Structures are given as structure tokens and as C-alpha cells.
């Protein structure tokens, strides 16, 4: 029994020491909803020149994340969340420490990052679901919004959401 215990302790010691400091330090928050604009009249154009509502995702990990195959919705317990196409990984992959803007315009013909859900200025939820359609990757329920003023995470405290008079889609919040 004593030999078994020593063997077990040695195995644990090997496993713990085999994890490099870098492996432990790369534990980020992963994929997060970082900023959004629920009433875009004249702030930020998409590549087609349209002023559409948008949600910005941020990859806080050290690995690329492809959101293709994940689901997006604005309604908790939505039985028909929008499936983000997996056919264009060049468009749907977020590089490490990178940003990606999803346009909420119900105009999927404009590309993989244009979803069938629109955001309500009056307030609602933003929910990103994993490929199993059940696991919430990140979500935020927001209050009533002001036109052309975005809401996003405070860079000094990611748990705090604040308003931005100068929205920054695809860039760090300021």
C-alpha cells in the first residue's frame, strides 16, 4: 500500500511539473462578447455601406477560434438560434487577442458574419452558443440603448459594462 501511495504521488508530481508556466498563463477568458451597438444610424458602416447593428467578439485566448458552427441569438431559450456558417473559416476565425464584428442585419446574402437576428434599442440579450446549441459561450442582457452610442466591457474591469460615445468595432474599447 505504501508503494502504491508513493507511486501515485510521483505520478502527480510528474503531471504538475510537466505543465509549463506558459501553459498555465495562457488560461484566458476565451471568447467573449466585448462591445455592441444596438441602434446604428450613422456611426459604423459594414463593408456594403450599411449602418447595421453589430456585436463585437474578442478572443482572449492564445489560440485562433473559429465561430463557424456556433449559434447566435438575442432571445434566451430560443428554439431557432442563428447558425453561424462554417463554410468560410477565413471570415469566421478570430485570431488570438483579436476582434470580430458580427452584423445584426438579417441580410445573410452579405456574408457569413451577417446574422438573421437584429438587436433591439429597447434592450434584450446577446447570446453566443457553442456548436451543441446548449452551452452558453458568453451572454449579456442589456438595457435600453442610445442611438450611435455603443456599450462594451471596461478594459480595466471586464465584468463592468460602460457606454462609449466613440464606438470601436474591431478594435480595443477606449
Please tell me what each predicted stretch does.
Residues 1-17:
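Sec-dependent bacterial lipoprotein signal peptides
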Amino acid at each position: 500500500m505504501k508503494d502504491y501511495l508513493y507511486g501515485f504521488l510521483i505520478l502527480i508530481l510528474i503531471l504538475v511539473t510537466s505543465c509549463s508556466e506558459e501553459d498555465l498563463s495562457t488560461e484566458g477568458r476565451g471568447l467573449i462578447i466585448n462591445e455592441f451597438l444596438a441602434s446604428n444610424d450613422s456611426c459604423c458602416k459594414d463593408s456594403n455601406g450599411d449602418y447595421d447593428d453589430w456585436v463585437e467578439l474578442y478572443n482572449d485566448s492564445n489560440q485562433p477560434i473559429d465561430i463557424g458552427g456556433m449559434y447566435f441569438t438575442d432571445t434566451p431559450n430560443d428554439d431557432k438560434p442563428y447558425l453561424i456558417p462554417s463554410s468560410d473559416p477565413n471570415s469566421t476565425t478570430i485570431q488570438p487577442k483579436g476582434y470580430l464584428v458580427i452584423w445584426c442585419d438579417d441580410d445573410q446574402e452579405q456574408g457569413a458574419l451577417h446574422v438573421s437576428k437584429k438587436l433591439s434599442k429597447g434592450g434584450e440579450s446577446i447570446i453566443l452558443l457553442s456548436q451543441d446549441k446548449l452551452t452558453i459561450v458568453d451572454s449579456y442582457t442589456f438595457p435600453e440603448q442610445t442611438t450611435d452610442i455603443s456599450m462594451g466591457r471596461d478594459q480595466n474591469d471586464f465584468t463592468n459594462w460602460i457606454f462609449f460615445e466613440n464606438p470601436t468595432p474591431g478594435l480595443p474599447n477606449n
